[in-house]
């Protein structure tokens, strides 16, 4: 049975909380095995499992890392999250604008995450 908009928004809220807390184990549990993340900047899809390592590294490098929500919306197939990624990185303050468009299956698990971000806005991560 298809998810309601309320269920989709609850899913997004849990995902955002786990992302902000640096808990990739929780975000992974919200995905089907083999879920993919597509990046706009290189037009490539990677296994969602590899993004957990990136999330962990980012939280280690930026103790005050956070995703400040600008907009959230349920879509016909999942949800959309627009956020500003902020924090104090080794090379200074970061403010990277991000949009994630997530596709959920009928069980409420992520099958696809499309991420739109300009990686140059994260250059301060490299110190």
Where are the language model's segments positioned?
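Short, low-complexity N-terminal intrinsically disordered segments enriched in polar/charged residues
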Residues: 1-33, 127
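A beta-strand edge to alpha-helix "cap/lid" segment located at domain peripheries
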Residues: 2-3, 53-127
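Soluble or luminal CAZymes and related metallo-dependent hydrolases
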Residues: 7, 11, 50, 94
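Phosphate-binding glycine-rich loops and adjacent basic patches that engage nucleotide phosphates
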Residues: 11-21, 45, 61-65, 119
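Short non-domain terminal segments
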Residues: 13, 39, 111-114
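Alpha-helix C-capping/helix-to-loop hinge sites
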Residues: 15-18, 38, 86-87
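A solvent-exposed, acidic/Ser-Thr-rich amphipathic alpha-helical stretch
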Residues: 24-76
């Amino acid at each position: 049975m298809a998810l309601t908009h309320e269920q989709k928004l609850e899913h997004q809220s849990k995902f955002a909380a786990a992302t902000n807390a640096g808990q990739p184990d929780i975000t992974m549990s919200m995905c089907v095995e083999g879920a993919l993340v597509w990046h706009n900047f290189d037009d490539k899809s990677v296994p969602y499992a590899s993004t957990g390592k990136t999330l962990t590294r980012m939280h280690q490098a930026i103790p005050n890392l956070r995703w400040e929500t600008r907009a959230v919306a349920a879509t016909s197939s999942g949800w959309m999250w627009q956020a500003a990624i902020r924090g104090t990185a080794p090379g200074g303050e970061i403010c990277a604008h991000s949009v994630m468009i997530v596709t959920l299956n009928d069980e409420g698990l992520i099958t696809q995450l499309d991420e739109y971000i300009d990686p140059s806005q994260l250059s301060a991560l490299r110190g």
